[in-house]
Amino acid sequence: EVNAIRLCAERCNEKDIKALEKAHENFLKYYDTPERVSHDFAFHRAIAEGCHNPVFKAMLLIVIPDIMAIYQRDRICAPTSNVLEEHTQMLDLIKKHDGEKAAALMAKHLQGVVDFAKRKLQAP
């Protein structure tokens, strides 16, 4: 996803930006509901669409259903204010076509998921 957002910022068009804005708007709307996770992933899916790379898009679509199930089961996607802020900042950086800053922010945004995956790999 770090490379996907970099490419999205570099390659996105007006249609992609509108889709990202709509996904972000829905994420905000459903933030305090159980639907938050699906709208969170819709935002990430819109980033994959906007990068115009079919491999990134296909890979994300393959893993999303399983990741969503794990997130909901283990409740690792608890609402935090930094998630809202990070999504807003990512959208702004994409609109500015700043791929490097967007990629750095995505890496930070996904660090909790990386840490969770490492713990799961080390668990008996």
Question: Where do the PLM segments sit?
Answer:
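Alpha-helical DNA-recognition elements
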Residues: 119
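Conserved amphipathic alpha-helical segments that form helical-bundle/coiled-coil interaction surfaces
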Residues: 1-73, 82-89, 101-116
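…primarily DNA-binding HTH/wHTH and HhH modules…
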Residues: 122-124
